[in-house]
Structures are given as structure tokens and as C-alpha cells.
């Protein structure tokens, strides 16, 4: 089983950018924790980060037929990128959307994500724990899909 973890714009600056909102944990630290979690679960994990919408879409497309599920933090793109939303809708694997901050306790424009309607679920507001919970959910979704009957059982 393989899980893809995708991070969007500005997440490469975690630990330095707005620490009062996003905390001081770096993306490298989050990735190391997810590697440990995946290893303990016997799951392969792959990471990708880009500040460019097209690169994120290309990554989602390239993962078709290669991964069993994804965890995505689209960053600000989640609020307005119809192209990213459509890419998530087009892939053949479930995705879990995560956000470090509670987007519903922030500015009004952050209360809605266009991507939420096409992912299996959304986790926000738990800091780095959002990623660990997202990975746990992605693993469970992938397991359910593998165990589903071939005649159209639910994929999560």
C-alpha cells in the first residue's frame, strides 16, 4: 500500500511563517513523523510539495494507478482553485484534506474550500496532528477499497 502526501503553497516555510497560526514545527519534522507512522503501519509513503498549482495537479495525475490514497494540504489553493478541485475529482484514489489551523476560526474567506466537496473528508485545526490523523484516515480508506467487493462496494 502506498500513500501520497501533497503540500501546497508556502508549506515549505512551516516553522517560520506565521508561527502564531501554524506553529513552529517544520515540514521536514512533519514528514519524519509521518514516515515513522507509515512504517509502523507497514505502508509506503511519498511526499511532494510545490508552490505552483500546475505542479500539484501534475503530481496528482502522475499518481493515478500508483498510489492507494492521498493526504493533501492544498494551502490557500483549497479556497479557490477549481483546477486543483477538478484534479482531485479525476483521480482514481481517495484523498483526505488537512489543514494545520482551524480554517473555520479564521478569516471568512478561509471558511470554504472548493476541494472539500471532492475529497473523502477534511481535518483541520490540530496542528501537525492534522497530518497524522489524515494519514490514519487515508490508510483506512485504502484498506477499505482493497477489501471492497469488485461489484461496486463503497470506496470511502
UniProtKB/Swiss-Prot annotation:
Molecular function in Gene Ontology: 3-dehydroquinate dehydratase activity
Active site positions, chain numbering: 22 (proton acceptor), 99 (proton donor)
SS bond list: none
Positions contributing to substrate binding: 73, 79, 86, 100-101, 110
Entry keywords, A to Z: Amino-acid biosynthesis, Aromatic amino acid biosynthesis, Lyase
Reactions accelerated catalytically: 3-dehydroquinate = 3-dehydroshikimate + H2O
Annotated Pfam families: DHquinase_II
Stored InterPro entries: DHquinase_II, DHquinase_II_CS, DHquinase_II_sf
EC primary class: lyase
Protein biosynthesis as UniProt keyword: no
Its EC number(s): 4.2.1.10
Site location (Transition state stabilizer): 17
Keyword check for Lyase: yes
Pathway assigned to this chain's UniProt record: Metabolic intermediate biosynthesis; chorismate biosynthesis; chorismate from D-erythrose 4-phosphate and phosphoenolpyruvate: step 3/7
Listed GO biological process terms: amino acid biosynthetic process; aromatic amino acid family biosynthetic process; chorismate biosynthetic process; quinate catabolic process
Record function comment: Catalyzes a trans-dehydration via an enolate intermediate.
UniProt record similarity statement: Belongs to the type-II 3-dehydroquinase family.
Subunit description: Homododecamer.
Protein name, entry field: 3-dehydroquinate dehydratase
Underlying gene: aroQ
